[in-house]
Regions:
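Conserved acidic carboxylate
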Residues: 10, 57
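Short hydrophobic/Thr-rich beta-strand motif most characteristic of the beta2 strand and flanking loop
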Residues: 27-36, 42-43
């Protein structure tokens, strides 16, 4: 399975380090941002394959980041947040998040969710390729 590039958007250094250490140990490529504005700029400039996004960012709320990114990109967004209330999850998913993982989380669950997202991306790419071949 191809290792996609992941944008990690997390302002809490220990959590960001846990995520990036896990990604590095499993040969994922990644870039990081500690702010929502920085995340939007990273998506525009680096076009990551997957975004891991915290909601509680210091400048703009993660749900607003989702809305901004969704206005021009379909990149899969997995929220990783301490916000565990149903309304927080619903707001993020309705804004365009593809998945929601609550903190604290296990690295095994994070990796499993990344694998699921990768499978979806590969399926979409395969279908797009097949459509192009038959046109």
């Amino acid at each position: 399975m191809k290792k996609f590039q992941i944008l990690v958007v997390e302002d809490d250094a220990p959590v960001r380090n846990l995520i990036t250490t896990t990604l590095r140990a499993h040969d994922y490529r990644f870039i990081t941002s500690g702010t929502g504005e920085g995340a939007v700029m990273e998506v525009a400039s680096h076009n990551p394959d997957i975004i891991l996004l915290d909601l509680g960012l210091p400048d703009i709320d993660g749900v607003e980041v989702i809305r901004r990114v969704r206005s021009w990109s379909n990149v899969p967004i997995i929220v990783i947040s301490a916000r565990a209330e149903d309304n927080d999850k619903i707001d993020a998913l309705d804004a365009g998040a593809d998945d929601y993982l609550t903190k604290p989380f296990s690295v095994e669950e994070l990796l499993a969710r990344l694998r699921v997202t990768q499978r979806r991306l590969e399926l979409i790419q395969n279908v797009s390729h097949e459509q192009a071949v038959y046109q």
